[in-house]
């Protein structure tokens, strides 16, 4: 039986669910396609690769979907509980992921890891400089 991974939405300090809120703004016919792409993480886990997902930097990855000329992305990472945490959803306007989107993803990932460490009593893992994690 293949391993099944968990998927969860990042929860903001104020209790918000930013990816769920973003999904509410996506056209209804596309929303199901975005959710289907995210569902692939359940069975593919961290080994699910291009064209479905790609690495942004370090543990930060993007779930990828193109509908017509529009590119939809959801930034996520797998936490220590073996759960894909959906961090940030956006419509991609350029070939590369904008630094502002990466910054949001990194901040939410750090927030989630900090809360997870506080809950489990563990220290968070030291960060590897982003430039060392870029694709070769």
Where are these regions (language model features)?
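Basic, Lys/Arg-enriched alpha-helical interface segments
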Residues: 1-71, 80-84, 91-136
């Amino acid at each position: 039986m293949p391993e099944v991974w968990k998927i969860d939405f990042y929860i903001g300090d104020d209790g918000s669910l930013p990816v769920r809120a973003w999904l509410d703004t996506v056209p209804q016919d596309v929303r199901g396609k975005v959710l289907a792409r995210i569902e692939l993480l359940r069975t593919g886990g961290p080994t699910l690769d291009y064209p479905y997902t790609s690495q942004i930097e370090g543990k930060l990855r993007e779930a990828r979907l193109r509908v017509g000329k529009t590119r939809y992305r959801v930034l996520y990472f797998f936490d220590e509980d073996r759960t894909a945490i959906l961090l940030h959803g956006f419509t991609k306007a350029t070939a590369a992921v904008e630094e502002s989107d990466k910054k949001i993803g990194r901040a939410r990932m750090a927030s989630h890891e900090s809360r997870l460490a506080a809950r489990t009593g563990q220290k968070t893992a030291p960060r590897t400089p982003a430039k060392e994690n870029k694709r070769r």
